[in-house]
Structures are given as structure tokens and as C-alpha cells.
Amino acid sequence: MARAIRLLAAKPRSIGEIRERLLEKNWTDAAIVDGVIEKLREYNYLDDDQYARDLALSKLRQKPQGRRRLQQRLSHKKLDRSTLDTAIKAAYETLPESDLIDTAIEKRVRLKGVPATHEERKKFTEHLMRQGFDYSLIREKLQQLEIDAAAPSNKLA
């Protein structure tokens, strides 16, 4: 029990991660670990639903990313599929994907400028796809960016 509490004190973990870490030691067996996990759940030290929601929001606030990338990152945390899906849905209700892609586009434009050539647009699109954003959303936002970029030059002429 003390080892489990020390692990949780270091950082929040899922039930699967705690189970794996406790079973690493030769002196533990599955029955003891299951008992410890049950006690931790009674004390509300372990809650996969809350852990998944907090982690999803934290990842989105750290760096804007699309659903695919977030799902891939959270899948390594040994959470069941329904918990992951619920947490991701809740995170994107709080921080809409269209706002996140706008933030990612603004950052990229600030660093590299508005893509002018076909090759630059292709690289920009690939960058956003690697961030996990959906292609249709990327295409829509980049078309809007090109319209916005062309608009000021028309006013000057």
C-alpha cells in the first residue's frame, strides 16, 4: 500500500499503470495488488474517469492537437476505450478542435509566414496532419487563411 501511495504522490496514474508498477516487484502477487487497488479506489485516490479527463485537458492546454493524436497519446496510459472516448469528447467540448487548429495555424504562420507556394502549403498541411487534425478541417482553415491573406493586399491596390 505504501508503494502505491508513493507512486501516486509522484504523479497521477491510471489503475492499469499502478497495477503494472506494483506487479513489477517479485514479492507481490495479483491478489495483494487487487486488494491495494480496491482500497485506493475506496479512498478516491484512484479514479480512471477523472484521471482521463484531467489528462486530456492538460495535453490540449499544453499543445494544440487533433483528436487522433490525443487518442494515440492517451492510449499509452492503460485506460479502457470507453473511458478514453468519454474523456476526449469532454475535452473537445471544453476546448473545440476548431479553436485549437486556429492556435496551431497562428503559431506556424508566426514562425514561417503564410504559405505561398504549393510546396509550402503541402508542408503546412502535413504538419497539421501530424498534429492529429482532420484533413477536411485543415483544408477549410487553410482556404480561409489564403482568403484572409489575400484580402489586405486587395485593399492596398
Regions found by a protein language model. Give the residues of each.
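An alpha-helical, amphipathic repeat domain used for nucleic-acid recognition
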Residues: 1-157
